[in-house]
Amino acid sequence: MDSMTEKQRYFSQPVERITGMDDTPERSLFRLTESGVYFREHRISAGHPGDPVEIVQITDVHFNYCDDIDLQNPELAYTKECRKWLADGASVGGIKNAMGFAKFADQIVITGDTLDYLSHGAMEMTKTYIWDVEPTAILAIGGHELTRQMQTGRPNETTLESRYADLQREWKHDVSYVSRVIRERVMVIAMDNDCGRYRPEQFEKLTADLAEARSKGYVVLLFQHEPIDTGRPEDACCPTLWECDGASYNFRHCIGSPERNDSETAKAVYRLITSSADVIRGIYCGHLHSAYYTEVIAGDTVIPQYVLEGNPYNGQVGHVMRILVE
């Protein structure tokens, strides 16, 4: 009788290294040769006894779909006419494959732009292919969830506040901030930072969660859509590990950079993050669609910051980040 579990069988398939070498695991990208899923790994040594806590990140799914309810809205009908990338739900294959990898983890986190734009059809896809598969999945939001206009050249016809409210009615957890403790060892925090913004209530919640993590010895993993400034001059032209939308990116013009006119709240959240390297062991983002590895200067140490490539690429095989806290 085959004594292998479903998880053991899944991860026994051959692995191909796409980029990187053994001595640079943070810059390595792999592919499972049978399922086709591309994956990266971040292993964190936390000195905890027992099996590793496993978190899987997916990002930038971009469900682009209008159903009959949406087509009664002239704004969405025009977006359907203009927006052709991944039209008619073409990204379903990619998320099904990525979720096939992620279902074995203790926690799934998706870091924004799950929706390509705010529509009933895209929300129904999110429920069917993500929350119905794993009801505990955490979905941080990006900018795409908050617009009904995509490549139309027109402004939204409703206020941002009303679109936040519409999204929140459909979301399974708070769209702004959510934290969860996994097996009393790892605290997962997901924050909305679309368009480079943070809000006062996020600062308050993050402050309280970091204090709890320190007192209880939790490893904190921070998930958000957009990356933050690394503080490293050389990262003004940081090369990608895997090119999709661009060969390099300026990580000195992200949230927290002195070059930006960020709000006082955004600056305060950035300072809080970069003064908390004792508990924050990784920052995980999307937004850029290509793969990057950076390190955020945090006092006399650094916090690893991984930017995961977008999920729909390479023929809808799926792209994931596997984080193991050991």
Residue ranges and their predicted role:
Residues 84-85, 112-117, 192-197, 255-259:
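The substrate-binding groove and active-site-proximal loops of carbohydrate-active enzymes
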Residues 96-108, 187, 196-297:
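His/acidic metal-ligating clusters that form di-metal
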Residues 14, 20, 25-47, 120-219, ...:
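Extended active-site neighborhood of metal-dependent phosphoesterases/phosphodiesterases
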Residues 51, 103, 135, 278, ...:
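Structured loop/turn residues at beta-strand edges in well-structured enzyme cores
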Residues 64-68, 147-150, 230-234:
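Short acidic/His/Gly/Ser-rich catalytic and metal-binding motifs that mark active-site loops
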Residues 71-86, 156-165, 238-260:
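Charged, glycine/proline-rich intrinsically disordered loops and linkers
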Residues 59-63, 112-114, 143-145, 193-194, ...:
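Active-site metal-binding loops of divalent metal-dependent hydrolases
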Residues 6-123:
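N-terminal active-site segment of His-dependent metallophosphoesterases
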